[in-house]
Amino acid sequence: MSEFFWDVQKIQEISNVEEHSVVKCVTVNTSRLISQLNEELQDEESGVNFIVTQLQLLINNVYEKIQKSPGVPAHRSLMINLNFTRLKFSIAYWDILLERSLDLINGPSKTGARYFITEVTPVDRSRYVENNQYFLAFKANQRLTRNSVDMDEFIDFEILIKQIIFDLFKKNGIPDQDFEAILSRFHNLESLVVAFNE
């Protein structure tokens, strides 16, 4: 059995993010992992295998802890935010490693939750979810979209679509405060992309 290099500091439920899901934010101190990783990365393939193995251990550990605690009703899906104190790599690379780790896991920790990785920030997530106007507007638009799009299809591509829109706006120099106004004028991603390419 591999040594566990993660330090799970706290597990916090973030309310009001999504009505059909319970979101658990798991703060994970990555300093021990990263110091070990510096040694492992001498050989790139063994470094990747090391991270994948460690992610599998973390996913199983966190999933078991969450399942032992009350508060995940059967009618709601579970989303687990692995919130790392330090990333070392980009979020995109961590997502690739996470996907590879999940592919190698069998059992309830793989099928019982959706996972995503973020980096710890000083922002209070609960307060952000309750007060941020852009997030609240996004949730309202998301509810409307849910009524017109098959839910499984929407979930599979949600992160990709957000990233495409965000990159498109940044590439075209659109300020954050104009996002909502521009998005309200378009009904799908294709028409938005076409408008920016004209």
Curated annotation (Swiss-Prot):
* GO cellular component, as recorded: condensed nuclear chromosome; nuclear chromosome; synapsis initiation complex
Pfam families from the entry?
Spo16_C (PF21698), Spo16_N (PF19225)
Which InterPro entries does the entry link to?
Spo16_C, Spo16_N
Q: Which GO terms describe its molecular function?
A: DNA secondary structure binding
Report the coiled-coil segments: none
Keywords on record: Meiosis, Sporulation
The job of this chain, per UniProt, is described as: Necessary for efficient spore formation.
- Indicate what this protein is called per its UniProt record: Sporulation-specific protein 16
Which species is this UniProt entry from?
A: Saccharomyces cerevisiae (strain ATCC 204508 / S288c)
What is the taxonomic lineage of the source species?
Eukaryota, Fungi, Dikarya, Ascomycota, Saccharomycotina
Q: Which gene encodes it?
A: SPO16
